[in-house]
Amino acid sequence: MEILSKSDDEIYELAKPIWDNLVKSSNLKDYGGFTRDFSTQMLFGANEVELGKQWANNKLITNLKETFEPFGCLRRGDHITVLIKQTNKEIPGEFLGRLVLGVEDNMVKVFGATIY
C-alpha cells in the first residue's frame, strides 16, 4: 500500500481507526489492544511492564476522550506524522497527539505514537 501520495483527508481516514483503538486501549490499560497496530520496530520498544507503569501513574493517557480532531500531516521519508488535537476527561485543555504511520508488509502500521 502506498500512503505517501495520499491527501491529508485520505490519511485521516486511515489514521482514525488506529488512533481510536489507541485511545480506547490506553483508557482500558489494554496492552494487547494498544499494540495491535504497531510495527515490528515499535513492538520491540513497547515493553508491557513499562507501559503498565505509565498507565498507573499518568491520568493524561488513561482518561482520554474518544473524540479527537486531526489537523495536519507531515511527510518525511517513508512515514507520515498525523497531528491530532486530543482532550481528556479529567484534565482541562487540549493536548497534541502525534501518530507516525508507515507501511510494513503492505499494511499501515504505527511507527510512533505520543501525546503531550
List PLM regions with ranges:
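Short, low-complexity N-terminal intrinsically disordered segments enriched in polar/charged residues
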Residues: M1-L28
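A common structural junction motif
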Residues: V103-N106
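Short, well-ordered alpha-helical segments enriched in acidic and aromatic residues
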Residues: N27-Q41
